[in-house]
Design a protein with these regions (language model features):
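Intrinsic-disorder/low-complexity, polar/charged segments enriched in Ser/Thr/Lys/Arg/Asp/Glu/Gln
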Residues: 12-18, 49, 61, 75, ...
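Short beta-strand segments that buttress and anchor functional surface loops
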Residues: 62-67, 90-96
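Hydrophobic ligand-binding cavity/cleft-lining segments
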Residues: 1-48
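Short beta-edge strand/loop motif at the mouth of beta-sheet-based domains
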Residues: 16, 36-73
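A short, structured loop/turn motif at beta-sheet edges
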Residues: 25-26, 56-57, 81-87, 108-117
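A conserved amphipathic terminal alpha-helix motif
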Residues: 125-159
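Hydrophobic/aromatic beta-strand elements that line small-molecule binding cavities or substrate pockets
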Residues: 19, 51-54, 76-82, 93, ...
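Short, solvent-exposed aromatic-acidic interface loops
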Residues: 69, 94-99, 121-128
Length: 159
């Protein structure tokens, strides 16, 4: 598996994202938890990411903003739950353009002989919230993020 797979089963308030990366899980974990690396891969290619806060610890808050070419901003925030590790990065996720529609994301990283299988499960409060996320065009950002992360991991391993 080298492409990002997105699964959103009808009637279930959940989105599952999986992708295998050609990099060790510790490096994939670092890319998920180091804000200097996060800005290099998270989100659509045509948006700039600014990380305002990223406290990777139990109860730690995070906040980042995507900015498009016209200067429009799209803010997101949440809180980490438990101590983030390659076994589980658990956090809430809320788009500031639709307050009150919080989802819980759990990302696991499984090492596979120098490669890493990433599995991210987003659980929504309702099927309607999940459907609104799917309808928002999130697939483009998810696919771009997967490609950009693979490119970043290749650069980090080459240096």
């Amino acid at each position: 598996m080298s492409k990002t797979e997105i699964t959103a089963e009808p009637g279930i308030p959940m989105i599952i994202i999986t992708r295998e990366f050609d990099a060790p899980r510790e490096l994939v974990f670092r890319a998920h938890t180091d804000p200097d690396l996060l800005v290099q891969w998270l989100g659509p290619r045509d948006l700039a990411l600014t990380v305002d806060q990223y406290e990777v610890r139990n109860g730690g808050a995070w906040h980042y903003v995507n900015t498009d070419a016209e200067g429009n901003t799209y803010g997101f925030h949440g809180v980490f739950h438990g101590d983030p590790s390659p076994d589980a990065i658990v956090q809430t996720f809320e788009f500031e353009g639709a307050p009150g529609h919080v989802c819980l994301q759990s990302t696991t990283l499984a090492g596979r002989g120098g490669k890493t299988l990433m599995r991210s499960v987003s659980s929504f409060q309702s099927v309607e919230d999940r459907d609104a996320m799917v309808a928002s065009g999130m697939e483009r950002g998810v696919h771009d993020s997967g490609e950009r992360l693979a490119e970043l991991l290749a650069r980090l391993q080459a240096s």
